[in-house]
A protein has these predicted regions:
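Nucleotide and nucleotide-moiety/phosphate-recognizing core
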Residues: 2-7, 11-93, 97-98, 107-109
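Flexible, gly/pro- and Lys/Arg-enriched active-site loops
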Residues: 47-55, 71-75, 79-187
Length: 187
């Protein structure tokens, strides 16, 4: 089944820039997903907490093995984030981070799971704020336009809906800074 992830970074870690952190994250995700396709990298103004650096964002789509559950994927994502310098215990919610990986879609699953004991286990799919995030919608539409034959038909069926969401949010402040082909050479 097709999994769609949104990736973002706006805080260098060790000697790595935000783009280098995205490259490292995609390399790690290759162990979890097959037939990976990725968008270009876009720069966008921060949302929610605006007093921080601009983000580098992209979307990755790939096929997950049937044995990989959404919660297993979430656990693996948290390990990747931690390995790339993300420390959730010390960060401001929606503040700067070395890497952020969100599950936007997991096939056609709809999940709404909340764990008050361990908020890191909470999961909502599709991502609940997709409709307000042009920095996810623009790269997602890029992938759908480039690889319609390789994308789950359920996801492709929502293309018009994504385009309508983008009309509402607008695309101001989201600028392509590295095309997918150039990014691919680094991965």
């Amino acid at each position: 089944m097709t999994v769609v992830l949104g990736l973002g970074s706006n805080k260098p870690w060790q000697q790595y820039s935000s783009i280098e952190l995205l490259v490292k994250a995609v390399r790690a995700l290759k162990a979890l997903l097959h037939d990976i396709r990725f968008s270009s990298v876009y720069e966008s103004a921060p949302m929610y907490v605006t007093d921080q650096a601009a983000f580098c964002n992209m979307v990755v789509a790939g096929r997950a093995e049937d044995s990989l559950s959404p919660h297993d994927l979430l656990d693996q994502i948290h390990k990747i984030e931690a390995s790339l310098g993300r420390d959730r215990s010390r960060e401001i919610r929606n503040g700067p981070r070395s890497i952020d990986i969100d599950i936007e879609f997991f096939g056609n699953k709809k999940i709404r799971f909340s764990d008050s004991q361990n908020p890191l286990k909470s999961l909502e799919i599709p991502h609940p704020r997709l409709n307000e995030r042009p920095f996810v919608l623009i790269p997602l539409l890029e992938i759908l336009n480039k690889s319609a034959d390789n994308v789950d038909s359920t996801l492709y069926a929502h293309k018009e809906e994504f385009m309508q969401m983008l009309k509402v949010t607008g695309s101001d402040g989201v600028v392509k800074i590295l095309d997918a082909e150039a990014f691919e050479k680094s991965v």
